[in-house]
């Protein structure tokens, strides 16, 4: 496993966390853009080989988001006070109707999600891995 950057103040700044609301040592993050993800990777706050349980590895989610930058990731940040300090990516969402190509690739990459909303209506697309 990659050694992650322990500068939690900088990590939280990238993620837009202004005040830490501790829920058992984690903080939910509802919107991680491709730019934020790139900055987290470039500053060693994300390990591209890491994954949330049965989710695709972060590198595959990152490649997907580079190709389709309107998607946003969601997940949580773990407190630097815990041994398992990290940012975990639990899934992605699209807040608009997907193109046929986006929909097809979303279904392929995230088919094993614990929760998936892939009816390509006005609500967009969503997946979550427990």
What are these regions (language model features)?
Residues 1-93, 102:
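Long, contiguous N-terminal structural blocks used for assembly/anchoring
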Residues 105-130:
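Acidic, proline/glycine-rich low-complexity IDRs
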Residues 97-106:
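Short, conserved charged micro-motifs
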Residues 95-98, 130:
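Short, flexible beta-strand-to-coil junctions
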């Amino acid at each position: 496993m990659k050694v992650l950057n322990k500068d939690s103040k900088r990590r939280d700044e990238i993620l837009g966390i202004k005040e830490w609301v501790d829920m058992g040592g984690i903080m939910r993050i509802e919107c991680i853009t491709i730019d934020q993800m790139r900055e987290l990777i470039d500053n060693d706050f994300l390990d591209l080989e890491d994954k949330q349980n049965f989710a695709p590895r972060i590198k595959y989610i990152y490649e997907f988001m580079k190709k389709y930058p309107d998607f946003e990731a969601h997940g949580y940040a773990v407190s630097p006070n815990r041994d398992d300090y990290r940012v975990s990516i639990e899934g992605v969402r699209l807040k608009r109707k997907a193109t046929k190509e986006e929909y097809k690739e979303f279904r392929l990459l995230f088919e094993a999600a614990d929760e998936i909303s892939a009816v390509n209506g006005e609500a967009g697309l969503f997946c979550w891995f427990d």
